[in-house]
A protein has these predicted regions:
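Eukaryotic scaffold repeat domains enriched in small/polar residues
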Residues: 1-154
Length: 154
């Protein structure tokens, strides 16, 4: 029996057999988003296939991004000028990157590997590092998510 998650009118059945990647492709998705064509994008901690794309039925379509990410953390797909764009957040790179749906880099916000100065040692990636913050600093310091306002601003 498939487990049910959620509550109230937002309940879902978990289908652990939904995704059908090629044999040997390990999909350890840390974040998921869906484009306007109902394609499902999994931001994945597999360094050879960090962005894995499935159709709505779980059939593998493609992957891209090999070698571009260190610690994938968040994905959002938004419309810009009538086109889907893919925003990705890499926690350890300290960046937000915008791509076309087929993986062409359009924009990078932040400096790769440049953590803001908050008093935390730059090599401390522990989950308790936030306890060592002594002062505020500019963007970014271990970013973990992306949000957009109704007007489209990030």
């Amino acid at each position: 029996m498939e487990p049910i998650v959620g509550s109230g009118k937002y309940t879902y059945r978990v289908n652990e057999e939904w995704q059908r990647p090629p044999a040997g492709l390990d999909v350890r998705a840390c974040a998921v988003s869906v484009d306007s064509q109902d394609r499902v994008y999994c931001f994945n901690r597999n360094p050879e296939h960090p962005v894995v794309i499935f159709d709505r039925d779980g059939n593998f379509l493609s992957s891209w991004g090999a070698g571009l990410f260190t610690f994938p953390h968040a994905i959002r797909i938004v419309q810009e000028n009538g086109q889907d764009v893919v925003w990705l957040c890499d926690e350890h790179h300290q960046t937000f990157q915008k791509f076309t749906t087929d993986g062409r880099l359009l924009q990078t916000i932040g400096e790769k590997g440049e953590r803001s100065d908050t008093g935390v040692p730059a090599d401390d990636f522990s989950s308790a590092a936030w306890k060592k913050v002594t002062h505020g600093g500019g963007p970014f310091n271990l970013p973990t998510d992306i949000a957009f306002a109704p007007d489209g601003s990030m």
